[in-house]
Amino acid sequence: SRCTHLENRDFVTGTQGTTRVTLVLELGGCVTITAEGKPSVDVWLDAIYQESPAKTREYCLHAKLSETKVAARCPTMGPAALAEERQIGTVCKRDQSDRGWGNHCGLFGKGSIVACVKAACEAKKKATGYVYDANKIVYTVKVEPHTGDYVAANETHKGRKTATFTVSSEKTILTLGEYGDVSLLCRVASGVDLAQTIILELDKTAEHLPTAWQVHRDWFNDLALPWKHEGNPHWNNVERLVEFGAPHAVKMDVYNLGDQTGVLLKALAGVPVAHIEGNKYHLKSGHVTCEVGLEKLKMKGLTYTMCDKSKFAWKRTPTDSGHDTVVMEVTFSGSKPCRIPVRAVAHGSPDVNVAMLITPNPTIENDGGGFIEMQLPPGDNIIYVGELSHQWFQTGSSIGRVFQTTRKGIERLTVIGEHAWDFGSAGGFFSSIGKAVHTVLGGAFNSIFGGVGFLPKLLMGVALAWLGLNTRNPTMSMSFLLTGGLVLAMTLGVGA
């Protein structure tokens, strides 16, 4: 699965009868949804971008100077003048120079002098700013079912589907082939202040240099460089790249301050680099909160017969995935398609299956299958696939796993924020409380009661509530009632 290859992975486990789960997706992360009686699904935020954003200012990094002219007057002869002074795109400077008999003046003193130079911008020496429009930013969400096929990190799963969202998008339904349909309703949120963000892009001149950065609007507008708006042929403040020398009689030198690319690159050190792909300008941060509908998902292969246990061989022996799960792959030499008999037992309990399958109902197909992912309790375990067996020690502790999943649940609820609550009606408010409980405690509940059936969990919740009602000690009564209520809420809830 896609999530197996990513470091930032989260699990959301639906309770009995789950039809909807709420996910928080961020760039670089991936969420695996597991629910009883449903295929597992990976969901991730693949990209945030805008196509062809609007240009704001263009800056010139290297001036192109031509047609230098100088005019001078003797003392008392009035100001020197050039017609170029009134022309757009020309830089001029007035000054006073020493005049006398040696440079063709009858009087000694200060005479007027003016120098002008035509200024443009060198080719491929511009820095352009682009602004985002929040209404046009596209959020790409991808969905991939766990099919039992091993897919390398650099390969694309044939069952992968894509949904795109903007601020005005409605619910999207994706068809996952034999696994049914999944619906997505996502609320989008950028991770940056778009009103204060500019993408600064340089003309491409060197392959080893980055070409775009994500900068603050005020910093961009304060750049001391010649600038213009798109479509305007003339540059403003072009004198910032031109220097005039000291006047000498009838001569005034004009200097080009040179290429400012190096100065700009030095100023951009440490600034986030922006990614541009064709006409797509990508944002580096942001998230979407998605409500995923699972009601039309269906398990594949439930009617298959069980595979012959003696005809399996390891293709990839069990390996730690890095996400507190174990992954493996087997080959099968018997009749296909069929269901893979897989289980795991803990040390000292040979009759209890402790494996929680992330790949539900693993199968061998005519053209693939055999990849299995499972979660095991900490400690010594034995994994069985048919007649194959493998000793496995799962690191960590049950308590640590509970705290970790609870922490992630709190993070998810924090990111969802105000959208997690509905104060419009009493029913909506209590539904919001239930959803919040599932979001925060769903992972911990599954870690503790993952191998317990629906009826035992229901009876346990009722028993704890009954004890709470019949206990005289107020503290113990409240503790039993609270614990029993949580167990019943997590067991009977239909949302996560």
Curated annotation (Swiss-Prot):
Q: What's the protein here called? A: Genome polyprotein
Give the GO biological process terms: clathrin-dependent endocytosis of virus by host cell; fusion of virus membrane with host endosome membrane; symbiont-mediated suppression of host innate immune response; virion attachment to host cell
Keyword Nucleus in the entry? The reply is: no
Transmembrane annotation, as ranges: 448-468, 480-496
Pfam families given for it?
Flavi_E_stem, Flavi_glycop_C, Flavi_glycoprot
Write the record's keywords in alphabetical order, separated by commas.
Clathrin-mediated endocytosis of virus by host, Cleavage on pair of basic residues, Disulfide bond, Fusion of virus membrane with host endosomal membrane, Fusion of virus membrane with host membrane, Glycoprotein, Host endoplasmic reticulum, Host membrane, Host-virus interaction, Inhibition of host innate immune response by virus, Membrane, Suppressor of RNA silencing, Transmembrane, Transmembrane helix, Viral attachment to host cell, Viral envelope protein, Viral immunoevasion, Viral penetration into host cytoplasm, Virion, Virus endocytosis by host, Virus entry into host cell, Zinc
Picking any one GO molecular function of the record gives: protein dimerization activity
One cellular-component annotation, GO: membrane
Task: For the region Fusion peptide, give the residue spans.
Answer: 98-111
Cross-referenced InterPro entries: Flav_gly_cen_dom_subdom1, Flavi_E_Ig-like, Flavi_E_Stem/Anchor_dom, Flavi_E_Stem/Anchor_dom_sf, Flavi_Glycoprot_E_cen/dimer, Flavivir/Alphavir_Ig-like_sf, Glycoprot_cen/dimer_sf, Glycoprot_E_dimer_dom
